[in-house]
Amino acid sequence: MSKRILLLGSTGKMGLALRHIFRDAYLIIGKNSHDFDALNFEQVRTIIGESSPDIVINTVAFLGIDPCEKEPERAFRLNTLYPKFLAELSNSNGFLLIHFSTDAVFSDEKGDFYTEKDCPRPLNLYGFTKYGGDCFIQAITKRYYLFRIPVLFGEATKNNQFVEKMLQKIHEGQKVLKISGNIISSPTYSRDVAREVWRIMDASYQFGLYHIANEGKASLYDLMKEITENLNLDVEVEAASYKEFPFLGIKNTFTPIKSEKISPLRHWKEAVKGYCNNIEKGVHSSDRL
C-alpha cells in the first residue's frame, strides 16, 4: 500500500513539481490556500488529523524580502511559528516532515558558495523569519528533511514570482527588460529539486539539513537572458543594478549555495534548457504534469 503524503501548498511552483515527480509512488493529498489557512493552526491540525499522513511536505511560506518588510507579523507567523507548529505535530502524530528553506538566510560576506556547514546570518526579515522556522524544526523534531533552495524557475500556474512576472511582461508586448545583474544566486529548476528530494527519501538519507541547487551561480539578468534566448523571444534583456529599482529590505546580493552532502545537480543552464523545452511543449499547469 502506498504511503500517504500530505502536500501543503500543492499548487505552487514547488508543489506542482513535487506532485509530478511523486505521483506514481505515493498517495498524494494536495492542499492549498483554498483548503486551509496556514495562519490558522487549528485548521492545520484538523487537516493533518483527517489526512493521517505518513509524510507531510510543506511548501507554504511568505516569500520575498519586501513583502515581509511590509507585513512583519504575517512573515513571523507563516515563516517561523507555522513550521514550529508542524514540527510539534510531527512529534505528536509521528509523520516525517519535509520543509523548504532559502538561501536568504545567509549574508553576502563569504564571497563563495554557502554549504550546510556555514552559519546563517540573515540580512532582512524574510531571511530572519525563515531561519527561525529552520531552527525550530531542527530543535523540536528528529524526523525531518530541511531543504534549502535558491531562486527557483519552473512550471507555474500563477505569475507571482520573478521569472513568471518577466515572461508576462514579454507576453504583454514589452520589448526591453531591465534586470538586476548584481544579485547573484544559484538559479534552480523546481523539477530538479523535486527529483533530488525523491532520491534522498528513496535512499533513506540521514534526516537533517541539505542544500539543493543546480550547479553554478548567476545573476537574475543571466537567468532571464538564458531563458529568453532558449525560448527565442523577441526581447532585449539589459543588465541593471538592483539599486535602480524600488526596494525596502536589505538585499541578499551574493548567496550561491551548494551541498557538501549530496552530488551536484546538472548545471543551471542545462536545467533552463529542460524548463524551456517543457514550456514549448505547453507544460504549464498541473493538468498537464
Describe each model-derived feature in a short phrase:
Residues E42-L78, N91:
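NAD(P)H-binding glycine-rich loop region in Rossmannoid oxidoreductase-like domains
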Residues L8, K31, T59-V60, L97-D103, ...:
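SDR active-site strand-loop-helix element
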Residues E196, A203-P246, C276, V283-L289:
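Mid/C-terminal beta-alpha module of Rossmann-like enzyme folds, strongest
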Residues C135-S185, R191-D192, W198:
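NAD(P)-dependent short-chain dehydrogenase/reductase
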Residues V235, N252-L289:
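C-terminal amphipathic/interface module of NAD(P)-dependent oxidoreductases
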Residues R77, L81-Y82, V105-F147, L152-F153:
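Catalytic helix-loop patch of NAD(P)-dependent Rossmann-fold dehydrogenases
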Residues K3-I21:
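N-terminal Rossmann NAD(P)H-binding glycine-rich loop of SDR-like oxidoreductase domains
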Residues G30-E42:
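Rossmann-fold cofactor-recognition segment
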